């Protein structure tokens, strides 16, 4: 029944939205806002306009509608006192249709108060354009700089029109309020771009100046600036906060769109809760109210329910114009139909204007649409009434095949290989997209459309729609909201609601704040124990300063990972901004406020324990000031890191920048480089460094006004025991000759240039920094739109791109309009399609034949069960079947019937549960160890490495999965053959890439199939939902491809979800499972599925209508479609049928006869893997190296971090002198060299996880290569890059610091330089192995990063720099000895500092007076000879003493002996080996499936 012939009353009565007894079904309702109060005259006009049966019929419809409305109470459903159960969303009798009618009548009762609004859209000459690159080359490490430089220069040049191409060619359309429009086209046709343009969501492309778009008189600028939430674009992806419940997610959206004019006495909370409940009841989500939304990694609602949450959230925005981009993705056809009915009802009753781009649209769904837009490569080839589109194209000369849906027919016209002209019209119909458009623009339908649009534009200019709409918009807004604002509630109300949502997120996953607080407490205990109970003496001055410095360092570091949560939330915040729910700045401010309690608890849990265990100044005032400054440090650094995150577009860039900034702040805080020793060029850094002011205040707070007993005197030791005090001096800076104490104030003044008067001043400066960075962060969030989405392009290697462009130029002959833009790879012209079809049928390489398969795989009584909540549940129940060469068997069933489970059981891929009964046989024999290598399994997900080309992916599979006896040339020839067979020649050298920049959906699916085919599966090919998520034409082409493979002798078993009649015709047999994994049918389909139809009709099914889709009819018959019920149990019908007996007899016959055939006794056929281990290892390692090489972002971010940090440290400590502070600085330069450790690991982890995902999801189950080859390849392939990085770091750090100069006196510059290079490169190799160890036993990157950070922090603390072995408590001494950094630092310091002379700076000399009658030589000489150091005699007779004269004395004090440098290097290398061994062990322990499920079954 077409839309044109459907009256309003029929829509309301014959297609009810909701079955009151089934709250789980998707019910028809969409969009609640002030548009509900349109007057009856508008409704009558629309009805009259839409009717094809005359005015009398329309009048009857209107009268009937008014009669229905008279029965509606028109009461407010929001006040909580709901007298009608049909209006209560929590009632089982809730009726969404009744609820909407009631709401409409309520609004009509006081239209002046509710101020209803509606919005249509019309456009003429609409053109969208972007950069003319539908193909580009993949940057590598060698050409990336050149590419980025040329792109930057091109941006600075005057725009060149030749660089742009039209995504949407000039087009015209009008969508009036109350009309539902569908947009049809193949992927890349411009459907998404059209919807984004209408929704004023044009970031990433441009709109032509000649384009005219009006929204009932409003311009796109008006919509973007003032009414953004009234015109929305809903993307096909589902992004939500995973730890927020469904109810909280929808109530949050409802609160932010709650209007001011919601009715008297109704508070916002009541209104929002009621609206959210209505939507949950309408879309069958009520039972999920308290369930987390979840995502791919967090358990939550199902994928289909998550899609419905997205739909409900978008609907709650109350938008007048809704642009839905493939919103039915992930929904089965019945649920999708219910959603479209909801859109239709929304348009009909509430006068909304929905547009939807949809794939695989059923006929029932299509008949609900008022208008249809058909796009072909960016050209609009039709716009008009949906009921007239088919007739238009048939009149053009195209044939619509029997049982093909209208939507599929319209879309198929844009596919040259699929469309079919009527006899006699072969030379008359248009062929190219431009010819189709020319035909359309010369048609009378187009002339009528342009006339209607022109009249609409004139009407918009005459009417005062803008002011009326503004009044309606302002009436909805809360108090203190600017009338020009697109938001419904005020800024501070937005902040309040987002704060509440953030607390709910914490409640949904309290583990994150709890673990953060507990980890801070544990780290406080561990770190404080290192400096435990410091004595109040001068020999603890360095350690006391080090303890304060590390507390600042830890508090600053604690906010670094906030960048990750910022990027995680950014897509959701951007979506909500487009829905006009709240400003990004409101979210920024709210996130800081909501996280403040957790931050304060974190600082308390660390700092309270740390402060008192270290024995810092124990007075209340000093403690609270310390805690105040540490909390301020956390806030300042949090705001700074957030600002960096807000100004960048990638996590890698943000983390690298943050690390360099943090490094600068630590070095110039005043401890690592005290102010007197900061070089002149860099003094400005300390003035803009907030950590400098914080550290100075903490040092003043600890030392000012205190006296410390001297811990060590000069001279001291044997012979000086009874020396009077006036003749000795304390060794500490700031000491006074003859005094037994040192003034703390004097010490920090002379050693650090810290002044007590700066204490509270610095606090004020810190607060100013916090406010400044807060303002910067909040402001930046408003302007950062994230990485710009590029158009769909295909990436090649640079050399391959040149060949591709030459080929494209030759085929297009310079005319961009002659075919696809810039040689677009998605489409071919008709001649190419025909030629390619003929070419591939013959095969391009006559010497290569498809593997002949004569073996038959069959199974009998297969039963599988899993344990769920301590209960064994049967998933498959005695399933029988077979797959023969040359046949395609379809595996169908309802969701949850066990289709994928059956595939996994048949292919031996089950990882849980037990096969309790049944046999799986090949030619009558049990499965052997080579079975998994003998099959191909095409998974539903297309999992590939993004930097691999199509040809490389196929070659990799062929090299490792084909027999090792076959030569490389033969394998390469076979790969070429499969490329031709799958019609992938045009993009064989293209990279897989990512969505938008790489292969499209169809090309990825073909590659997935190809990877399995090149393995030469001699037995059969499994395909799991190969058409899922594809448009109907792509699904059809995949099925044609399967048919071609079967015709070449391949046996195929394929699961498929509700196929069209055309797709069903490609299958030979059907195995249908009903709920519980029970067989309802197994047998031939027959021509037009007649054999299957006859079977069900024979056993009592209603006859199949001639025009019906047999698949959908069968689903209705067996009760597998939503809302349908079977007349009988078809499992029992099957088991008692003669057809079942025939199947059993055939299985028994095959077992008896086939088992007599000779078996393949080739020993290689029984191997678990086709290739030997060494070959697996080499190929996997090389692939990983190539992946890194083609990921210049990864390599350059690593290089930039290494070069910037090494140079920064090197020049900050530039040619440090060999005095007391200089030695200290050189040691801390080594310490700071290790600080970027965690960032190196954070950069590496995502790439490891990408490889692991491909291996574990696809390559491991197919026995491509072993787990040992995978982990070994990952480890060793990273080492060459680390050696290069270490070499660069060596030159950037070692020479600027000046350590090489210490080797000059002993003429050992070369030997010590080589050892230093080995040490530094070993450090970088260690970082990669540590990262791989952390991720080897963790599923999530965050957990691995946290583990690595914790281990790294402990290594730094116990390495002997901040606290030596003589200070570390005895309990922790094992941490010092088993710490790899201990030996590395000792080796680096001994190699860099040994055997050099020390000369104290003047401020480092201590002065003392010799006893009466003695000279400096006689008095101090014996001491310096025994203890080391040197002295000089001053003019006044006093002695100036430097306590050391050789770097070896300093090295001995920190246990870094030059004689042990090679031993220490060897120990550190051993730690690298331990990392590698543990990585392999933990990967095997945590990730490799153990045991043999076949053995378990036999037990």
Swiss-Prot record:
The chain crosses the membrane at residues 512-532, 546-566, 596-616, 621-641, 660-680, 763-783, 1194-1214, 1229-1249, 1279-1299, 1315-1335, 1354-1374, 1465-1485. The gene is CDR2. It comes from Candida albicans (strain SC5314 / ATCC MYA-2876). It is found in: Membrane. One of its GO terms (biological process) is xenobiotic detoxification by transmembrane export across the plasma membrane. The keyword Transmembrane applies. GO terms for molecular function: ABC-type transporter activity; ATP binding; ATP hydrolysis activity; phosphatidylcholine floppase activity; phosphatidylethanolamine floppase activity; phosphatidylserine floppase activity. Belongs to the ABC transporter superfamily. ABCG family. PDR (TC 3.A.1.205) subfamily. It comes from the Eukaryota. This is Multidrug resistance protein CDR2. Keywords: ATP-binding, Membrane, Nucleotide-binding, Repeat, Transmembrane, Transmembrane helix, Transport. The lineage of its organism: Eukaryota, Fungi, Dikarya, Ascomycota, Saccharomycotina.
């Amino acid at each position: 029944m077409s839309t044109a012939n459907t009256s309003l009353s029929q829509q309301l009565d014959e297609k009810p939205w909701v079955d009151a007894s089934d709250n789980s079904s998707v019910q028809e309702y969409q969009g609640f806002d002030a548009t509900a109060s349109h007057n009856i005259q508008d409704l009558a006009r629309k009805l009259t306009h839409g009717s094809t049966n005359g005015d009398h019929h329309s009048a009857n419809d209107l009268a009937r509608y008014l009669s229905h409305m008279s029965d509606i109470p028109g009461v407010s459903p929001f006040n909580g006192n709901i007298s009608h159960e049909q209006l209560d969303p929590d009632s089982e009798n809730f009726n969404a249709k009744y609820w909407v009618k009631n709401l409409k009548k309520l609004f009509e009762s006081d239209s002046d108060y509710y101020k209803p609004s509606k919005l249509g859209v019309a456009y003429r000459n609409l053109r969208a354009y972007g950069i003319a690159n539908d193909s580009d080359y993949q940057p590598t490490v060698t050409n990336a700089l050149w590419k980025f430089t040329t792109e930057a220069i091109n941006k600075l040049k005057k725009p060149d029109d030749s660089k742009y191409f039209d995504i949407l060619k000039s087009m015209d359309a009008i969508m009036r309020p109350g009309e539902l429009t569908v947009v049809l086209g193949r992927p890349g046709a411009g459907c998404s771009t059209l919807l984004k343009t209408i929704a004023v969501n044009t970031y990433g492309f441009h709109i032509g100046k000649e384009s005219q778009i009006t929204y009932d008189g409003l311009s796109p600028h008006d919509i973007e600036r003032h009414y953004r939430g009234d015109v929305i674009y809903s993307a096909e992806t589902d992004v939500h906060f995973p730890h927020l419940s469904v109810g909280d997610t929808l109530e949050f959206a409802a609160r932010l769109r709650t209007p001011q004019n919601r009715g008297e006495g109704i508070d916002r909370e009541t209104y929002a809760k009621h609206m959210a409940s209505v939507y949950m009841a309408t879309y069958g989500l009520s039972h999920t109210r308290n369930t987390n939304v979840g995502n791919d990694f967090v358990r939550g609602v199902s994928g289909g329910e998550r899609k419905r949450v997205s739909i409900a959230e978008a609907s709650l925005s109350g938008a007048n114009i809704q642009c839905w981009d493939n919103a039915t993705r992930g929904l089965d056809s019945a649920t999708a139909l219910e959603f479209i009915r909801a859109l239709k009802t929304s348009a009909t009753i509430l006068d909304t204007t929905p547009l939807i781009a949809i794939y695989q649209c059923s006929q029932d769904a299509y008949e609900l649409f008022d208008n249809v837009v058909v796009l072909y490569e960016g050209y609009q080839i039709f716009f008009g009434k949906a009921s007239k589109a088919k007739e238009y194209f048939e009149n053009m000369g195209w044939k619509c095949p029997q049982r093909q849906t209208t939507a599929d027919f319209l879309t198929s016209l844009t596919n040259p290989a699929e469309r079919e002209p009527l006899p006699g019209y072969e030379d008359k119909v248009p062929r190219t997209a431009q010819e189709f458009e020319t035909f359309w623009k010369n048609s009378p339908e187009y002339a009528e459309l342009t006339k209607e649009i022109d009249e609409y534009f004139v009407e918009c200019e005459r009417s005062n729609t803008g002011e009326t709409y503004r009044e309606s918009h302002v009436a909805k807004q809360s108090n203190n909201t600017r009338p020009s604002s697109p938001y419904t509630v005020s800024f501070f109300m937005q902040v309040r609601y987002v704060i509440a949502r953030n607390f709910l997120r914490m409640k949904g996953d309290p583990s994150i704040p709890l673990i953060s607080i507990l980890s801070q407490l544990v780290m406080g205990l561990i770190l404080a124990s290192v400096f435990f109970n410091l004595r109040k003496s001068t020999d603890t001055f360095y350690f006391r300063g080090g303890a304060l410095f590390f507390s600042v360092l830890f508090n600053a570091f604690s906010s670094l990972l906030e960048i990750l949560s910022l990027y995680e939330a950014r897509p959701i915040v951007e979506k909500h901004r487009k829905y006009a729910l709240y400003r990004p700045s409101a979210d920024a401010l709210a996130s800081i406020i909501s996280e403040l309690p957790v931050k304060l608890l974190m600082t308390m849990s660390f700092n309270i324990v740390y402060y008192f265990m270290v024995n810092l100044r124990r007075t209340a005032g000093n403690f609270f000031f310390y805690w105040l400054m540490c909390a301020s440090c956390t806030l300042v650094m949090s705001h700074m890191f957030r600002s960096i995150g807000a100004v960048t577009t990638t996590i890698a860039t943000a983390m690298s920048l943050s690390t360099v900034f943090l490094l600068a702040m630590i070095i110039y805080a005043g401890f690592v480089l005290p102010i007197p020793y900061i070089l002149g060029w860099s003094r400005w850094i300390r003035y803009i460094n907030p950590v400098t002011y914080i550290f100075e205040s903490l040092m003043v707070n600890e030392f000012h006004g205190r006296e410390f007993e001297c811990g060590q005197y000069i001279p001291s030791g044997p012979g000086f025991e009874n020396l009077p005090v006036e003749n000795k001096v304390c060794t500490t800076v700031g000491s006074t000759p003859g005094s037994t104490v040192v003034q703390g104030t004097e010490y920090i003044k002379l050693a650090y240039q810290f002044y007590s008067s700066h204490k509270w001043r610095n606090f004020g400066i810190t607060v100013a920094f916090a406010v400044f960075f807060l303002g910067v962060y909040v402001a930046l969030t408003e302007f950062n739109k994230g990485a710009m989405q590029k158009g769909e392009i295909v990436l090649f290697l640079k050399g391959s791109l040149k060949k591709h462009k030459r080929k494209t130029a030759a085929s297009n002959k310079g005319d961009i309009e002659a075919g696809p833009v810039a040689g677009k790879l998605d489409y071919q012209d008709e001649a190419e399609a025909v030629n390619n079809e003929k070419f591939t049928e013959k095969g391009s390489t006559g010497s290569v034949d498809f593997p002949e398969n004569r073996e038959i795989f069959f199974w009998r009584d297969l039963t599988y069960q899993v344990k769920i909540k301590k209960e064994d549940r049967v998933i498959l129940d005695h399933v029988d079947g077979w797959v023969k060469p040359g046949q395609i068997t379809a595996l169908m069933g309802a969701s949850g019937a066990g289709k994928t489970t059956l595939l996994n059981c048949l292919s031996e891929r089950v990882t849980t549960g037990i096969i309790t009964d049944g046999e799986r046989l090949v030619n009558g024999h049990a499965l052997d160890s080579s079975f998994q290598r003998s099959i191909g399994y095409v998974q539903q997900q297309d999992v590939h490495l993004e930097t691999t080309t199509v040809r490389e992916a196929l070659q990799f599979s062929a090299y490792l999965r084909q027999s090792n006896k076959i030569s490389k040339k033969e394998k390469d020839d076979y790969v070429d053959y499969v490329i031709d067979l799958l019609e992938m020649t045009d993009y064989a050298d293209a990279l897989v890439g990512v969505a938008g920049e790489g292969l499209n959906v169809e090309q990825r699916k073909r590659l997935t199939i190809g990877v399995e085919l090149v393995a030469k599966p001699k037995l059969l090919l499994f395909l799991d939902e190969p058409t899922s998520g594809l448009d109907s034409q792509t699904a059809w082409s995949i099925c044609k491809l399967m048919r071609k493979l079967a015709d070449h002798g391949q046996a195929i078993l394929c699961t498929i979800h509700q196929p069209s009649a055309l797709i069903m015709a490609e299958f030979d047999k059907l195995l249908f499972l009903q709920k519980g994994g029970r067989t309802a049918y197994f047998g031939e389909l027959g021509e037009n599925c007649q054999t299957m139809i006859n079977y069900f009709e024979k056993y009592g099914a209603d006859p199949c209508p001639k025009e019906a889709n047999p698949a959908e009819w069968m689903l209705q018959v067996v009760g597998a479609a939503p809302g349908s019920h079977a007349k009988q149990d078809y499992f029992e019908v099957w088991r008692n049928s003669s057809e079942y007996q025939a199947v059993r007899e055939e299985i028994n016959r095959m077992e008896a006869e086939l088992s007599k055939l000779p078996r393949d006794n080739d020993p290689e056929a029984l191997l678990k893997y086709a290739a030997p281990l060494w070959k697996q290892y080499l190929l996997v390692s090389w692939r990983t190296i190539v992946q890194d090489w083609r990921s210049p972002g990864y390599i350059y971010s690593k290089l930039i971090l290494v070069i910037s940090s090494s140079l920064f440290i090197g020049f900050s400590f530039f040619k440090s002198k060999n005095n007391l502070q200089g030695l200290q600085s050189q040691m801390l330069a080594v310490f700071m060299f290790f600080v970027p450790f965690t960032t190196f690991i954070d950069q590496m982890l995502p790439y490891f996880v990408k490889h692991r995902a491909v291996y574990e999801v696809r390559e491991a189950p197919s026995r491509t290569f072993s787990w040992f080859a995978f982990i070994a390849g990952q480890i060793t392939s990273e080492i060459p890059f680390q050696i290069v990085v270490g070499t660069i770091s060596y030159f950037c750090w070692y020479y600027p610091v000046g350590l090489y100069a210490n080797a000059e006196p002993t003429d050992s510059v070369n030997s010590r330089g080589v050892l230093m290079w080995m040490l530094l490169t070993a450090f970088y190799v260690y970082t990669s192995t540590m990262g791989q160890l952390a991720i080897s036993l963790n599923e999530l990157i965050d957990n691995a990063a946290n583990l690595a950070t914790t281990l790294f922090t402990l290594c730094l603390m116990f390495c002997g720099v901040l606290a030596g072995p003589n200070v570390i408590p005895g309990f922790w001494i094992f941490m010092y000895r088993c710490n790899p950094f201990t030996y590395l630092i000792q080796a680096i310091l001994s190699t860099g500092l040994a055997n050099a002379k020390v000369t104290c700076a003047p401020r480092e000399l201590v002065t003392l007076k010799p006893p009466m009658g003695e000279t400096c030589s006689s008095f101090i000489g014996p001491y310096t000879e025994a203890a080391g150091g040197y002295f000089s005699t001053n003019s006044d007779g006093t002695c100036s003493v430097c306590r050391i004269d050789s770097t070896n004395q300093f090295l001995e004090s920190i246990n870094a002996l030059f004689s042990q440098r090679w031993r220490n290097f060897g120990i550190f290398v051993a730690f690298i080996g331990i990392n590698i061994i543990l990585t392999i062990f933990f990967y095997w322990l945590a990730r490799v499936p153990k045991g043999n499920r076949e053995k378990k079954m036999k037990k």
